[in-house]
């Protein structure tokens, strides 16, 4: 060996991590990857990532060839050692260094910076020197395989890989035949890439013809390379700084200082490289990979919807009636072909989810010290409930080329794209009780027939209640005075006599057409006394009117509280009109022309009309009283001569209730109630008096429908019981028995839910 060769061996340096290959002349199938522990440090840094073998592997991996298989053999020729470094006494016997290298050390000075070390020494000479090695050559065959393509071509990827292994093992026996067969497989399937490698004396006649020095160094387990850090040939005062500079160059790519503290190592970036800790290229690749995985996730769901199993399932679903989520779930569970296809989807999405999680963890680990914060959200798995809702949307919200989402609670579609053309005709609901027995053939949205106990009315099933004409024999709910609201408002303004209800005015505190002081509560009542005078009628109130006159420059604002007794009784058995609440109307105040009088009108209309027997009106006033008048009493005659007091006085010249009377047959209704009462006490069957039960249920429903409004969530007032008590003179026990009998018939025979009511009387 000449001096040039020995000198080259002395200063041969290795730039990165050395991957030890499998045992001599044994095949090796490995998945190349970077150590997870140092992902954020060595990713895209150092010469290792620019080496020929690593770049070749990365390129193949991006093309889908995820598995590498290599078979090789080595030929050792010479064993070389660095005898100069093996000397222990470097002071007496210094290492024979090249003049250029010695000059570079002298240029460093005694306190060099990291950048000086990198530019002067490391970039030129590297970080390690060779202690001992074996010179020789290598002959290798490398195959990159895509198992997914092999699986599609042959049906079994495991058997295909084993067959390729057996074929490659004959490479050193029949090189030409093996390569010819492998090239045929490569061209026909596209699932493998084959590469031959020959280095060292096998491929070259002399050292001068070699492409690189490393091609003659054997790196197997039998022929190990022994390296030593370059700091051993530096003076002692430069050794620590060299190690720090070498680590900064390898781990930080020369863009910062490599620092370790509390078992945590990082790069302290220089000002011109603020992102040295951030492998932006790898982060972009991972973000792109995650985006593709999310697309694959969505495509997996689309593949199921486009599969033959799913399409056949949709065709087998019945279309002659409405399908709820529960009924679709039942059909879903009974379709075995669809279940097997759905299990394949679940296993595929689970594997995809694990890949996404691993990639996301790597992404967030790499971006720990980056200014760039990755924004990634794991795709949500579609639950079985969402699949059933999707089926429902495909059934009813997929029309005219538009699509939408079906809401079962509202039985309607929310169309996408600001249109309402996606909804198909929603079929009727088939079931028990008031559901349809069959949908109409002419219009599938309407009922064609009903269950027993129900009748078909305008495409809907309603209980077979008694005819309205029969109910009219007991109470004449329908009269000639059932005007529309606009007509009622016009008649009230004209004070039409047809709407007058003649009542008796009662008050111990107020006289009509007489001024009084309203600063304290005043009470007045309007009653009919139907129990004595008009026993064959019950009465309906649709409005009220009062004419109130005030003194000039008066600051009073009257305020009314109105209580209504529907069928007589004490004051506690009345209810308060909730003015302005729950949609209830307010008083309307209109001033009369050339007068200090106002017409106060309350129009209930058809929506809020109700029964009444007595109306109690409490009058108060809202005003700011002077300090001297706050402690005065309001009793006694008024003094109109005192100008400081008369501005508070008002008078009521007229109070009128508007409505009409309904004919009421108390004897006939009492006999029907007694029949139900006797049947209940004797334990008789309900069907023996079903017509009477239906009649009383209809009357109770129509009476309670006229109850006053209540707050949301609170039960409605029971006016029917008040009528039984005050107009039919039933006892409390009889009222309870009648209501209980009606409730039992309604729930057990008609299968309808009872409406909760609150006791008033």
Swiss-Prot record:
Primary role: Plays a role in neurogenesis and brain development. May suppress cell cycle progression in postmitotic neurons by inhibiting G1/S transition.
Supply the name of the protein: BMP/retinoic acid-inducible neural-specific protein 1
- Alphabetized PANTHER family for the sequence: BMP_RETINOIC ACID-INDUCIBLE NEURAL-SPECIFIC PROTEIN 1 (PTHR15564:SF7), MACPF DOMAIN-CONTAINING PROTEIN (PTHR15564)
Q: Which GO terms describe its cellular component?
A: cytoplasm; dendrite; glutamatergic synapse; neuronal cell body
Pfam families listed in its UniProt record: BRINP, EGF_BRNP1-3, MACPF
Output one GO BP term.
Answer: cellular response to retinoic acid
What is the predominant subcellular site recorded for this chain?
cytoplasm
The miscellaneous remark of the record is:
Silenced by methylation in 50% of bladder cancer cell lines.
**Which residue ranges does the record assign to the MACPF domain?**
68-251
């Amino acid at each position: 060996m000449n001096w040039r060769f020995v000198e080259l061996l002395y200063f041969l340096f290795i730039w990165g991590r050395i991957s030890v290959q499998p045992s001599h002349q044994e095949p090796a199938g490995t998945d190349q990857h970077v150590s997870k522990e140092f992902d954020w440090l060595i990713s895209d840094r150092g010469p290792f990532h620019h080496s020929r073998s690593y770049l070749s592997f990365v390129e193949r991996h991006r093309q889908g060839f995820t598995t590498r298989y290599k078979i090789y053999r080595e030929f050792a020729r010479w064993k070389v050692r660095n005898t100069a470094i093996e000397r222990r006494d470097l002071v007496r016997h210094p290492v024979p260094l090249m003049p250029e290298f010695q000059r570079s050390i002298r240029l460093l000075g005694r306190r060099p910076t990291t950048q000086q070390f990198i530019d002067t020494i490391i970039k030129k000479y590297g970080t390690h020197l060779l202690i001992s090695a074996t010179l020789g050559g290598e002959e290798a065959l490398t195959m990159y395989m895509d198992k997914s393509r092999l699986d599609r071509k042959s049906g079994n990827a495991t058997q295909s890989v084993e067959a390729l292994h057996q074929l490659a093992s004959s490479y050193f026996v029949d090189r030409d035949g093996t390569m010819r067969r492998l090239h045929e497989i490569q061209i026909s399937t596209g699932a493998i890439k084959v590469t031959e490698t020959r280095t060292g004396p096998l491929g070259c006649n002399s050292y001068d013809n070699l492409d690189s020095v490393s091609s003659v160094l054997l790196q197997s387990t039998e022929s190990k390379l022994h390296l030593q850090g370059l700091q051993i040939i530096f003076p002692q005062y430069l050794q620590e700084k060299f190690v720090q500079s070498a680590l900064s160059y390898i781990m930080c790519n020369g863009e910062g200082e490599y620092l370790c503290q509390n078992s945590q190592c990082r790069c302290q970036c220089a000002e011109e490289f603020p992102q040295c800790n951030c492998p932006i290229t790898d982060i972009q690749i991972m973000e792109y990979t995650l985006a593709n995985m999310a697309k694959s996730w969505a495509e997996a769901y689309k593949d199921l919807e486009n599969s033959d199993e799913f399409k056949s399932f949709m065709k087998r679903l019945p279309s002659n009636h409405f399908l709820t989520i529960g009924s679709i779930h039942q059909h879903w569970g009974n379709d075995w072909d669809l279940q097997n296809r759905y299990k394949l989807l679940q296993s595929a999405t689970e594997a995809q989810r694990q890949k996404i999680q691993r990639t996301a963890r790597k992404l967030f680990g790499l971006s720990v010290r980056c200014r760039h914060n990755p924004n990634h959200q794991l795709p949500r798995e579609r639950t079985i409930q969402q699949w059933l809702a999707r089926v429902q949307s495909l059934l009813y919200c997929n029309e005219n080329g538009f699509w939408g989402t079906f809401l079962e609670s509202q039985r309607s579609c929310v169309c996408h794209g600001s249109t309402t053309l996606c909804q198909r005709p929603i079929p009727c609901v088939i079931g028990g009780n008031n559901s349809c027995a069959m949908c109409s053939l002419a219009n599938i949205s309407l009922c064609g027939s009903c269950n027993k106990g129900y009748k078909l009315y305008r495409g809907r099933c309603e209980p077979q209640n008694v005819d309205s004409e029969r109910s009219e024999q007991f109470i004449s709910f329908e009269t000639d005075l059932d005007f529309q609201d606009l007509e009622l408002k016009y008649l009230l303004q004209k004070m039409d006599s047809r709407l007058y209800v003649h009542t008796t005015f009662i008050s111990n505190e107020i006289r009509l057409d007489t001024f009084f002081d309203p600063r304290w509560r005043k009470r007045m009542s309007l009653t009919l006394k139907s129990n004595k005078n008009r026993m064959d009628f019950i009465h309906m109130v649709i409005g009220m009117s009062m004419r109130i006159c005030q003194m000039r420059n008066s600051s009073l604002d009257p305020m009314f509280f109105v209580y209504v007794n529907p069928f007589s009784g004490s004051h506690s058995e009345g209810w308060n009109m909730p003015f302005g609440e729950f949609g209830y109307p307010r008083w309307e105040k209109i001033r009369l022309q050339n007068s200090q009088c106002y017409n106060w009108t309350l129009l209930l209309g058809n929506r809020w009309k109700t029964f009444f027997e007595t109306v109690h009106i409490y009058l108060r006033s809202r005003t700011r009283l002077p300090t001297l008048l706050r402690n005065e009493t309001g009793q006694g005659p008024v003094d109109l001569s005192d100008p400081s007091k008369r501005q508070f006085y008002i008078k009521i010249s007229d109070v009128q209730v508007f409505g009409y009377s309904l004919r009421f047959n108390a004897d006939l209704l009492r006999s029907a109630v007694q029949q139900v009462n006797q049947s209940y006490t004797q334990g008789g069957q309900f069907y023996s008096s079903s017509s009477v039960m239906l009649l009383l249920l209809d009357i109770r429903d129509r009476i309670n429908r006229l109850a006053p409004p209540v707050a949301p969530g609170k039960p409605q007032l029971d006016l029917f019981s008040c009528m039984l008590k005050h107009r039919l003179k039933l006892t409390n026990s009889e009222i309870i028995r009648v209501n209980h009998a009606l409730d039992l018939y309604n729930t057990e025979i008609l299968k309808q839910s009872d409406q909760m009511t609150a006791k008033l009387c």
